[in-house]
Amino acid sequence: GSEMCIRDRAVTPRTAGFNTVDLTDLSEAGQFITIALMLIGGSPGSTAGGLKTTTIAVLLTTAISTFRRRENANLFGRRIDDDVVKNAATISLMYITLCCTGGLIISVSEGLPMLTCLFETASAVGTVGLSLGITPELNLLSRSVLILLMFFGRVGGLTLIFAALSSAQKKVSKLPKEKITVG
């Protein structure tokens, strides 16, 4: 009954997009939660798209360590390397930026509500396959945006980052550190 429906709503947005309910019946809050679940995909080694659960765990652990004023983020008795934190932050920022930018382009191009467009872009970048039913009516620009997001979501953020930066040469010297106030 309802327990199976709840499990389905938690698992479906993070995997293959098999759908058992009409998503257009979701409230705005339900759509927002589904968007978040589509962006946070499965674990490493799985075929699920989206941000890996370990990426989110690294970011949450780092945030908690920052709030507690700890020098390093620790998880399961191990220190998380700064490069891992940088990669997690970069990939997460890329996913969120692409999803929001794509949603904005589609919303402006089609005159549709932003939340509806974000639902479609999160599904594309997370390679989930869920839809609110607007995709067949989209113009060429909007469909092209979704195709590019699907490609990014399938190939993966880190792969594209390394491919784009592989020709960059490493600098031998290091610049001095600067303390920047963030808030």
Which functions belong to the PLM regions below?
Residues S2-G183:
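Membrane-proximal intracellular helices of multi-pass ion channels
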